[in-house]
Amino acid sequence: MRTLWIVAMCLIGVEGNLFQFARMIDAKQEAFSFFKYISYGCYCGWGGQGTPKDASDRCCFVHDCCYARVKGCNPKLVEYSYSYRTGKIVCETYNRCKRAVCECDRVAAICLGQNVNTYNKGYMFLSSYYCRQKSEQC
């Protein structure tokens, strides 16, 4: 399984906080749930366009919007500190940029966990053909 994890990270392009975000998702669902979202719908994974396909995809859309609002740093490369307290993800970073990125990831992980029942395997590796509609505004 460790080899699969390493291969997946190489395929999608490892970024600074990707591992942290993956661990947050796994904390709100079952282990290795992150893999379900590597390429899901129109927004989960690299980039995004069109209309989110379901509530899970909308979580990724909102996450992308959150990253777009983080100014003065690169949210995909920022590493931050967080912990789990009584089942909750707690961002512990005081740096403005790092805290904002941590909060984006925390909210998205919670959202994906709350909407896991909307997950549709048919949206995994969805062709961009189905995401051609005009993108919503953040």
Curated annotation (Swiss-Prot):
Entry-linked Pfam families: Phospholip_A2_1 (PF00068)
Which Cys residues form disulphide pairs?
C42-C131, C44-C60, C59-C111, C65-C138, C66-C104, C73-C97, C91-C102
> Which range is the signal sequence, renumbered to this chain?
1-16
Q: Which Gene3D superfamilies match?
A: Phospholipase A2 domain
Q: Which domain of life is it from?
A: Eukaryota
Keyword flag rRNA-binding: no
Q: Where does Ca(2+) bind?
A: Y43, G45, G47, D64
Q: Per the entry, which co-factors are needed?
A: Ca(2+)
What's any one GO cellular component for it? Answer: extracellular region
Family the UniProt entry places it in: Belongs to the phospholipase A2 family. Group II subfamily. D49 sub-subfamily.
**Name of the featured protein:** Basic phospholipase A2 Drk-b1
From which source organism is this entry? Daboia russelii
